[in-house]
C-alpha cells in the first residue's frame, strides 16, 4: 500500500549543499578511531573555514591507519601541526586532534552505490593564502 506524505522529500534531503571537489581550509571538529574488518581508521569531521561560500559546511571522511596507509596519516598529522611529542611516541590523542587547522584537497567517489569523500592531499594552514589565490580566481569565487 502506498501513501502520499507531503514534505517527506524535503526532510530526506540534506539542507546544506554538498562541498564540491576542491581545496579547503578546514578545522578538525571530531576524530574517532574505528575498525572496519581488519582496517583501522579515523573517522574525521572537518568544518570548512574557507572559501567563504562553503564556510560552516562539514566534510566527513575516513583516514585509514593500516601499515600501507600510514604515510597518509603521518602527512595529515604533520601538516595539521599535530603535537610533535605525541607523534614521536607513535601516539594519536583524539582530543588533541580537535581544533587543528589545515588545508585539505578532497574528491568524491561512489563505491557500491555509497558516496564517499576522499582526502587526496594536505597542506599546513600557513599555505592557505598562497593556494587560495590561484584556486579562488580560477573558480570565480569571492573570499
Language model features by range: what are they?
Residues 1-143:
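Short beta-rich binding modules
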Amino acid at each position: 500500500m502506498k501513501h502520499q506524505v507531503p514534505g517527506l522529500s524535503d526532510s530526506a534531503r540534506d539542507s546544506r549543499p554538498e562541498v564540491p571537489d576542491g581545496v579547503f581550509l578546514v578545522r578538525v571538529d571530531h576524530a574517532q578511531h574505528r575498525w572496519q574488518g581488519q582496517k583501522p581508521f579515523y573517522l574525521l569531521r572537518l568544518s570548512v573555514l574557507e572559501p567563504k561560500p562553503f564556510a560552516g559546511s562539514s566534510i566527513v571522511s575516513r583516514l585509514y591507519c593500516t601499515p600501507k596507509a600510514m604515510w597518509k596519516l603521518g602527512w595529515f598529522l604533520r601538516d595539521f601541526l599535530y603535537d610533535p611529542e605525541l607523534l614521536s611516541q607513535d601516539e594519536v590523542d583524539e582530543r588533541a586532534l580537535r581544533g587543528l587547522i589545515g588545508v585539505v584537497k578532497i574528491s568524491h567517489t561512489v563505491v557500491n552505490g555509497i558516496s564517499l569523500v576522499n582526502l587526496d592531499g594536505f597542506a599546513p594552514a600557513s599555505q592557505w593564502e598562497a593556494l587560495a589565490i590561484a584556486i579562488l580566481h580560477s573558480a570565480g569565487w569571492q573570499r
